[in-house]
Amino acid sequence: MKKIFQYIILAVVTIVMASCTSDIEETTATTGKSNVQLVVGEFPAFGDSQTRAIGTLDEGKTSWTEGDELLLEMTSKTLGTKYAAFKYNGSSWELASGELSYKEDEVPTFPHVYYAPNYKWDAGNLVLKEGKVAGTDEYIEGTAQITPNGEAITVKFSGATRNYSRLRIATMPNKPITVDTEYFTPAGSSDMEQKGNYTLTSDEKGNACLYGTFENNSEVTVKYRGATLKTYKFSKETENAKSYALDATVISAKSAEEIKSAIKQEVANSKTAIILNLASDAGDNEFKTIREAFKNVQDATIDLTLIGCKEIPADGLKELNALKSIFLPDVTKIGMNALSRCVYLEEICAPNVSTIDERAFAGFIMLEKVTLGELTDVRGEANSGGGIFDDDNWTPYIDLYLPKNQEVMKGEFDENSNQYIWKPTGEKYFATPDYDNGIFLGYQFNSVKSWE
């Protein structure tokens, strides 16, 4: 006769956390004793140190929740090795797939039991689930054994050792971020990546996590829609079972007064790379405050990133001599004269902009690089004094970057608006002679390239 298991009794020992010593280190995990057999026991949490109050403290997952899975491997003399996944339904563990069976007069063993949300069994091997990426969740191995009466399996994580660390990235709540890594070994993998790229979404507290090992001199760069929020280089290899916190938070400044205060503080702290999270509907009053706040700042010193706002209104950042570069990851519309006569500006990056009004980028003498989104509405005729750039005096020195799906733009005068308007034709721009010759919107550029 053979036994088939449909449930698991869980006995879990909480992993106790200690404080940290490294510059961004948060916690140290060691094992303790608190053994109680329960249908659901405590999850072996990382914890979060009170000594590193970066962002909103987050100890991570602390208990089993509905939908959690455990992956078990069982071996018996007669029936061999079996594999199964058990899923937690909120009150008990149920067999989700596979089978665990053995002859009643034998005592099976359990070579492996995993909590690894990104993985599943496939022909006896752990493989990534579709759409999952190693390093974006836990990979914990516990132990399991048959109970003396043969009625259940007891799974323990009391001796579980994480052979990886956690990097908690504190940033804006509920936002997609990308994380570029160097010399990183994801949890569950033995292959170190010289260069990696991860797409994460922060939770409502603004936290997103990577699980794995960073080598000495490993570098991490956190970006939001291409805008760099934080770059950090590790001064030593991360330690197993420790949690680290990386501060990629952004100053939230919704009102004019908050904007004024934030810029004043950043300038007082000698910051030159300034990132502000504005309201999506930030308008004339907020941008007037930005101009005034930078009025007495040294020319050509500020790399400004404005997150959240959807539009730069007419004259919004006009004649802002402090600007050296500007990044506008969420902006879809740039108004008339919005950035005109920012004479020391060297780079403009607006990868989601689709609408640009007359003379938005006029009056530049230092501009070298412009990155734009897929344009659908551009106002102003080139070389007429009313185009988005100055006449051909300066555009031949500019490298223009467009998305690969950009269409050819055709311009004509519109009597209703009394403006010259460029609209897409349906023809792919990067398959035309104008692309080869560096011509776009009637302007001659140093080069035109795809940024995708």
Where are these regions (language model features)?
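Sec-type signal peptide cleavage vicinity
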Residues: 2-10, 17-265, 365, 452
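Assembly/interface hotspot detector across virion components, adhesins/toxins, and nucleic-acid enzymes
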Residues: 86-88, 119, 144-146, 198-202, ...
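Surface-exposed substrate-engagement region within the catalytic domains
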Residues: 207-211, 219-226, 373, 390-407, ...
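N-terminal segments that cap or nucleate solenoid repeat domains
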Residues: 251-294, 451
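Structural signature of tandem-repeat unit edges
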Residues: 275-280, 299-311, 321-333, 343-355, ...
